[in-house]
Regions:
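Conserved SAM-binding loop
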Residues: 2, 36-37, 103
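Short, intrinsically disordered, charge-balanced linker/junction segments flanking boundaries
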Residues: 1, 181-186
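Internal alpha-helical scaffold of NAD(P)-dependent oxidoreductase catalytic cores
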Residues: 5, 9-16, 93-180
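Residues at the starts of beta-strands that form the adenosine-phosphate
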Residues: 1, 78, 124
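Rossmann-like NAD(P)(H) cofactor-binding subdomain of soluble oxidoreductases
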Residues: 7-10, 16-94
């Protein structure tokens, strides 16, 4: 089952997964073993009490890199994090087999479930504490968001001077390929 506040988002994901969807938290089933909560970091904490209510014995998992695992501790008995370190866009397909997943849980049985869940998508599964994940998320912002900002500045500079940004793509691609074999400082 998929829940989203908007029918468009709920129906799109539910259709891809072949499951029903709901747009009210009151309609979310109460007998699932795991609730995977994938929302913007800013709304996670306010949503938690309503998501957990009536489902306290289930395993609750969020996917936020910058939010600690313990956001669940006042409401849920079993909880954790399954963080896919990847930039995600609705308009682009992601090959999850190549994505690194970082997991953390408040108990060993829960951790094993999260490892298995992540391993069903990728063989790049790592344990990381909330503190480690904070630095991981910060490093990801540097590697991805800052790079994208630099691309935007580059595109603006080129377009302003009548040059195509596409001319930069071979350089960008080679730079990205090099980091697979050389340390970034090289």
């Amino acid at each position: 089952q998929v829940y989203s506040r908007t029918e468009a988002s709920a129906s799109e994901l539910a259709s891809r997964l072949g499951v029903p969807f709901v747009t009210s938290l009151d309609e979310v089933c109460t007998d699932a073993d795991i609730y995977l909560v994938m929302v913007k970091d800013a709304v996670l904490q306010e949503l938690i009490p309503d998501v957990v209510k009536g489902r306290e014995e289930a395993l609750f998992v969020h996917t936020a890199g910058s939010m600690p695992m313990d956001v669940w501790q006042d409401c849920a008995c079993r909880y954790g994090v399954r963080y896919p370190m990847q930039t995600l866009s609705k308009s682009r397909e992601v090959d999850f087999a190549s994505v690194s997943f970082f997991v953390e849980a408040n108990g060993e049985p829960e951790l094993e479930v999260l490892k298995e869940l992540a391993a069903s998508l990728s063989d790049k599964v790592y344990e990381a504490t909330s503190a480690q994940r904070t630095y991981l998320h910060m490093a990801a912002v540097f590697a991805c968001n800052f790079a994208n900002h630099m691309y935007a500045l580059s595109a603006h500079l080129l377009e302003k001077n009548g040059l195509p940004f596409g001319a930069m793509l071979p350089l960008i691609d080679e730079t990205a390929r090099k980091v697979h074999g050389l340390h970034p400082r090289n």
